[in-house]
Amino acid sequence: MYARSTTFEGMPANVEAGIAFVRNEAAPMLAKAEGCRGLSLLVDRATGQCIATSSWDTEAAMRAGDRELRPLRDRGRDILGGSLEMDEWEVAVMHRTSHGECCRVSWLQGDVEAMTETFRVGILPELEQTPGFCSASLLVNRATGLGCGTTVWESRAAMEASRVVADDLRRRTADEAAGEIVEVHEYELAYAHLHLPEMA
């Protein structure tokens, strides 16, 4: 399984219009794309930063759909009123127990194999014991050594309450991967229809 994420640095006042665009235009178009499993949208209403992620059965399917979907990304950028950056990933881990409202995204640089094993064997069991936890995923780019870990929580209160635990788990993952934490950001999960299978 593969994923493409597009990070929009938009205007806070345009976030609601961006959500409507994803729900009413982007999602229906992606539903017709061969090999596409779905779409999610994370938003930070305070900064205007939004991340749209599409999931794909194969790398070939993801690449094949790129030309057709490029105008869609450009339209999303215009609606949100900012810039965009695109990343492509392999889905290394996916585990879901229930749906949630908010998520925390952590970007780490390091040994991708060690990062994946630590996330699967050491991190997931502890997350499952944390109140309010709903799901977790790890996307990796083997060429760059970058990993993107996302945890989903049932509410903003649950996400905030998990920060101390999350900080410890994140540091442990970075240490095991002989790497570093690049960035951490919390978002509202505005649209969640990725339809990825269990990969834990």
Regions found by a protein language model. Name each.
Residues 1-51, 57-200:
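Short S/T/G/P-rich N-terminal loop/turn motif that feeds into the first structured element of a domain
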